[in-house]
């Protein structure tokens, strides 16, 4: 039979160990949801939608770079860039995979706390322009349209008219997105 002093010391050590484990910082890491994966349900973490230039895979994969820049944040990244995109899919409502993509993007945009729109130079991105227009009044957009984007003037005028936050560089975009996600986390996802 163990002595009461030894048992007390063991319990005390166990309490200290438990407190240390509880106090250890959790490793933050984003959950990345790529279309057409299902959107998470009842996930309280802030969500960011990475909208903008894809050009059916022809634009640089800026979404991957921004996702890496968020790698230390406990957020959900909603990425519409599909690695399995098939150029043979007709852009029509009766094309099942095309419809699935559009419906996924619409749902992801609605569920996002922060919406990024990056309009890469040399691209046209008409669907991203449409999505920007749909969400210009929502207060969730952060937009980067550098010189060389096909309709930079339209983006600039619309952003000014509706108070959309614009940035000038990818570094500024990253900083603005990180701050907006931190603000969303502080407010609480379902507080809006």
Where on the chain are the PLM-derived regions?
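Bacterial N-terminal signal peptides that target proteins for export
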Residues: 1-13
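Conserved catalytic or regulatory cores that recognize and/or transform ribose-phosphate-containing ligands
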Residues: 17-192
């Amino acid at each position: 039979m163990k002595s009461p002093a030894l048992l007390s010391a063991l319990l005390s050590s166990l309490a200290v160990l438990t407190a240390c484990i509880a106090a250890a910082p959790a490793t933050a890491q984003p959950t990345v949801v790529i279309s057409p994966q299902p959107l998470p349900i009842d996930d309280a973490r802030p969500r960011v939608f990475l909208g903008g230039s894809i050009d059916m895979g022809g634009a640089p994969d800026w979404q991957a770079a921004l996702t890496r820049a968020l790698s230390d944040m406990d957020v959900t990244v909603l990425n519409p860039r599909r690695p399995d995109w098939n150029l043979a899919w007709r852009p029509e409502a009766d094309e099942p995979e095309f419809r699935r993509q559009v419906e996924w993007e619409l749902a992801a945009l609605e569920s996002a706390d922060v919406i990024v729109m990056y309009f890469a130079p040399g691209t046209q991105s008409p669907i991203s322009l449409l999505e920007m227009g749909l969400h210009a009044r929502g207060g969730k957009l952060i937009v980067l349209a550098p010189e060389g984007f096909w309709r930079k003037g339209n983006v600039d005028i619309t952003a000014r008219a509706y108070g959309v936050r614009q940035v000038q560089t990818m570094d500024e975009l990253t900083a603005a997105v990180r701050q907006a996600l931190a603000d969303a986390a502080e407010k609480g996802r379902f507080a809006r």
